Structures are given as structure tokens and as C-alpha cells.
């Protein structure tokens, strides 16, 4: 690829943050239930705030736990943005009548090696399949990627939502996204490279937990603001 061609590539960087832990679920599956999360661990949010880009645009699902998580990041010293768009397509999978069931007992009933609540094409009773979730998440990503082309996008979402985004970045293979752990408050970065005839993804980090690193390991807490300019390339 010539230098002229490289200059026409637009890079959009997605910074996915999973919401903080839910403590009030009673050990039950909550899916799309609008349930609050625990944002009391200041050390976690201090660390997350350090690696997110200051000039990003913000998105979150329509569920309160993603908004509480964003508020906790801002309270940790991250400059609060002028606005944060609410994107219902980034909500967790609707698990229908499985919501409210004991999580451990339900998962114990699934086949050994299962990465999710069910096969990707199996809908929950009166709910969604993972493929339903994947389809709506991908459509929203494509739409936002056009609207925010060339920017940093921070999206506060859910485990299933982020697994779907990883599946898209892995070449549109949702089942591969399910193989990844996405822990609470973890950061996953997916870079999209677009030109007139090319659309490619790169996965710089998945399930990064910056609070685990000791402060003396400066490389684990690299700044992500304007001073860091990611390479604008396709590979």
C-alpha cells in the first residue's frame, strides 16, 4: 500500500468498558433487568480513568448500571463529557424467562465447555438469542462508526455486548467472541480501519484490567490522551 493510500485510511478507536459488578442480583440471572451496580471500589475507577482517552465521545446502553459506571469514572478524575449518548442497541441480551433463575444452577445444566447461556442461535424463552444481540450490536457499531469516524469512542456496555463487538472485530464470527472473558470494569479496545474499499479491525487489547498492575509498572498505565497518536494503518 502506498503512502498516499495510507493517508486515506480513517481509524476509529473503540474503548469498551463493561459495567461495574452487580451485587443485588441474589445470584440470579439478570440479563436486561435494570439493576444497579456497585461502584464503591475507587482504586478500580482511578486505574480505568488513567487509560481512557480524554477527547473521546461517550456512549452507554439504556440500562442504569452502565450510566453508574460512567459516573464513577468521571468521579475518579476523568473530565466529564458534555454529553453521553444512550444506545439501547448496546443493552445486554434479553434472557427472557431465564432472568431471575439461579445462575449457578442454570449454568450447571449447560453442556461442558459452554461459553454462554445457550448456543448462539438458541433464543431464551420469550427473549433473544445471542445472534439477535450480535445483529443489533453490529448494526449500531456500523452506524456509530460512520457518525464518529476518526474519533475515539468510549462505549460502556455489558459482557454480551462486548463479546459481540469482539466477534465482529474477529471477522464477523460471533461464536469466537464468546470465547473471551469480559470482566466487570475491564477495558477492551477495538480499532476500525476504513477506506473507500477496505474495512479491517485490530484488537489492541481485550479484557484489560489496569487496576491489577502495580503503580511502579508505568508501561501498564500508558496515557491515552492527545499525546498518544495510534498508527493510521491497515495492518
Ranges and model annotations:
Residues 132, 154-160:
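His/acidic metal-ligating clusters that form di-metal
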Residues 3, 8-79:
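Active-site-proximal alpha-helix that buttresses catalytic centers in soluble enzyme cores
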Residues 30, 35-36, 75-139, 204-207, ...:
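Phosphate-handling substructures
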Residues 72, 164-168:
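Active-site signature of alpha/beta-hydrolase-fold catalytic machinery across serine-
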Residues 55-62, 85, 152-156:
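Short glycine-rich phosphate-binding loop at a beta-alpha junction
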Residues 159-163, 186:
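GST superfamily/GST-like fold recognition
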Amino acid at each position: 500500500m502506498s503512502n498516499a493510500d495510507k493517508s486515506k485510511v480513517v481509524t476509529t478507536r473503540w474503548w469498551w468498558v463493561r459495567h461495574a459488578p452487580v451485587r443485588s442480583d441474589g445470584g440470579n440471572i439478570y440479563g436486561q433487568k435494570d439493576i444497579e451496580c456497585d461502584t464503591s471500589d475507587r482504586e478500580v475507577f482511578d486505574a480505568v480513568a488513567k487509560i481512557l482517552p480524554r477527547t473521546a465521545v461517550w456512549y452507554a446502553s439504556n440500562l442504569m448500571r452502565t450510566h453508574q459506571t460512567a459516573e464513577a469514572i468521571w468521579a475518579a478524575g476523568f473530565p466529564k463529557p458534555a454529553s453521553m449518548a444512550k444506545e439501547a442497541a448496546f443493552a445486554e441480551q434479553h434472557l427472557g424467562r431465564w432472568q431471575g433463575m439461579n445462575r449457578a444452577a442454570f449454568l450447571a445444566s449447560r453442556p461442558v465447555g459452554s461459553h454462554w447461556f445457550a448456543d448462539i442461535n438458541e433464543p431464551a424463552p420469550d427473549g433473544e438469542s445471542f445472534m439477535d444481540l450480535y445483529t443489533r450490536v453490529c448494526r449500531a457499531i456500523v452506524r456509530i462508526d460512520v457518525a464518529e469516524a476518526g474519533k475515539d469512542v468510549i462505549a460502556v456496555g455489558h459482557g454480551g455486548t462486548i463479546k459481540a463487538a469482539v466477534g465482529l472485530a474477529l471477522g464477523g464470527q460471533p461464536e469466537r467472541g464468546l470465547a473471551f472473558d469480559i470482566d466487570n470494569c475491564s477495558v477492551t479496545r477495538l480499532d476500525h480501519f476504513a477506506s473507500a474499499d477496505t474495512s479491517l479491525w485490530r484488537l489492541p487489547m481485550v479484557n484489560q484490567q489496569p487496576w491489577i498492575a502495580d503503580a511502579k509498572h508505568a508501561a501498564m498505565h500508558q496515557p491515552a490522551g492527545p499525546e498518544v497518536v495510534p498508527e493510521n494503518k491497515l495492518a
